[in-house]
Amino acid sequence: MRHLDSSIPDYVADQISDRCLRCYDEQQWYGKNFLFDYIGDLDVTGKKILEIGCAEAGLMKFYNDKGAICSGLELSDIRFNNAMLLNQDQSIYLFQADICKPITYENKIKDTYDIIIIRDVIEHIPEQELALKNMYDLLSVGGKLFMSFPPKFCAYAGHQQTVPKILGKLPYLYLLPNSIYVFYLKLIGCPEKKIQYLLDTKRTRITISKMKKIINRIGYDVQKKSNWIIRPAYSFRFGLPRILNPFSWIPILNEIFCNGMLFLLTKEQR
């Protein structure tokens, strides 16, 4: 079976890659099995929720089914088209835009949001502080922002797990100097487009300490944070139990052994 959501018609599933169908399943699973409880709002009926980098918008489908008023912003043509195909019967407002460029979304957003979610996306954005400042402006007073990302020096911060060949999936491989990294990737037959993606990701990675400084400068309040050695999504992907990083209190080790850093931030009245 190519996907877990039996409500997806075959003619829709046939237009979408197996990987993206699995991402759609994971997005719904993540909302149901982790994020809903982590954010802590027992009733989201009527709440306005925006996901930045919604991809297939499976997470927004979960919240839409819970009664929330959901919107999804996506930059990628492929992922946006996937979202439109998969959510044809959902009342989710989907639009293409760049969170770093308000001109691309200001005519599509008419109100502020109670909850904004940016899950494993911020590490791909070159202008991270600008993106988070723009999200702050889109958040209602008292609203919450959930953000997750793999820190700069963790085992798979370079996203090399997406390389097709097993020899490209080695932990910490991205820490090689670029010239050696590219040579190795070419040697194992990695496509040029994938190599460029990996180099782009390597360039935009961010440390936990730098992210904390950005959060403070913008004016977010930290309601909750957690540092995971086996992050929640790994339960879906690999059947592993989620485990907090036992070294989270030790500088450097808190970065190296963290495979997922999570923040729940709020915008308070000033």
Locate predicted features:
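Conserved N-terminal segment of class I S-adenosyl-L-methionine
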Residues: 1-111, 115, 132, 227-232, ...
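A short beta-strand submotif of the Rossmann-like class I SAM-dependent methyltransferase core
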Residues: 118-121
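Generic signal for short, ordered secondary-structure residues
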Residues: 14-18, 41-42, 123, 190-194, ...
